[in-house]
């Protein structure tokens, strides 16, 4: 069920080649990497280098999401609902 939604999102994004640098596409790619690393770490709990990589990718995605929420709140809400991500906490 989740894979189908990602396939539809990526097919929409890949139709427009010029949008590969867009924030939405970057967040989508980071989310896929995060989900792959999370499933890998469920099997290999002591893979500390992968844990570090996961934390770095999480930070990058968080920075992009915070930038998007400041610049365009509507696009941010749509992206979060499409990718099934929790909304970040505001300080």
Swiss-Prot record:
GO BP: any one term: translation
GO MF annotation: an example: structural constituent of ribosome
Pfam families assigned to the protein according to its UniProt record, in alphabetical order: Ribosomal_S15 (PF00312)
Oligomer and partners: Part of the 30S ribosomal subunit.
Keyword Ribonucleoprotein: yes
The species this protein was found in: Eucalyptus globulus subsp. globulus (Tasmanian blue gum)
SMART domains hit by this protein: Ribosomal_S15
CC terms in the record's Gene Ontology section: chloroplast; ribonucleoprotein complex; ribosome
Principal subcellular localization: plastid
UniProt-annotated location(s): Plastid, Chloroplast
Similarity section: Belongs to the universal ribosomal protein uS15 family.
InterPro entries found in the cross-reference section: Ribosomal_uS15 (IPR000589), Ribosomal_uS15_bac-type (IPR005290), uS15_NS1_RNA-bd_sf (IPR009068)
PANTHER family associated with the record: RIBOSOMAL PROTEIN S15, BACTERIAL AND ORGANELLAR, SMALL RIBOSOMAL SUBUNIT PROTEIN US15M
Protein name: Small ribosomal subunit protein uS15c
Annotated keywords: Chloroplast, Plastid, Ribonucleoprotein, Ribosomal protein
